[in-house]
């Protein structure tokens, strides 16, 4: 069971160890996710030149591949980085932004799954269903499906690729193909701010880098995200002030907030 103590242990470990998270991510969220990693205590590198991918794998603690604003050169960099990480046994977290919305996105995400074998896939319900082979009803990069509607697809995807799958929603779902964990917390304000899903992805990567195992890191990363989001929402007046409050809360996240603002249960 993942207790409050487990979540807090990994929150503290990220601060103590400052894992380097190499993120090849989209233009929309570079600043947002880098600042979130810094607030959590991790160290971001936002490199994407093909020529430096192997070197980045030599210093990183985890790799994030986010397909939000794809171009062919970025796909090349993602594959080079992913293969270098796999060779070094670094955990890779895939964020299949908009999978199902275009053939480029879906094909690229599936290629990463096949060749890189990421440790974690974190997406919304529609993205996960699209990768699992079901009709995901993706609306651009937004989801038309709830996390619970994608449970079966998430389990199938996890079993097929040996990954932990995180399905974000009002209640987050985390599965390794067998066990199913629910993370309850957060705020309705979170989907009103661009980059919150991508932020969850990098926090999962930071937690996986320090956790006892991948499943634990995925669960505690999402729990930290939910706890910070819940408290930040109460301290803000709307989406604009929420962004600032979220970083402040993430930076000062403590055991009491984790205990009071998030619930992790096994389904």
Curated annotation (Swiss-Prot):
EC category name: transferase
Protein keywords: ATP-binding, Kinase, Magnesium, Metal-binding, Nucleotide-binding, Thiamine biosynthesis, Transferase
Catalyzed chemical reaction(s): 5-(2-hydroxyethyl)-4-methylthiazole + ATP = 4-methyl-5-(2-phosphooxyethyl)-thiazole + ADP + H(+)
Molecular-function GO term, any one: magnesium ion binding
A single BP term in Gene Ontology: thiamine diphosphate biosynthetic process
Amino-acid positions noted as binding substrate in the UniProt annotation, renumbered to this chain: 46, 195
Binding-site residues, ATP: 122, 168
Cofactor: Mg(2+)
Keyword Protein biosynthesis: no
InterPro entries reported in the protein's UniProt record: Hyethyz_kinase, Ribokinase-like
Function: Catalyzes the phosphorylation of the hydroxyl group of 4-methyl-5-beta-hydroxyethylthiazole (THZ).
Family statement: Belongs to the Thz kinase family.
Protein name: Hydroxyethylthiazole kinase
Organism: Nitratidesulfovibrio vulgaris (strain ATCC 29579 / DSM 644 / CCUG 34227 / NCIMB 8303 / VKM B-1760 / Hildenborough) (Desulfovibrio vulgaris)
Protein encoded by which gene: thiM
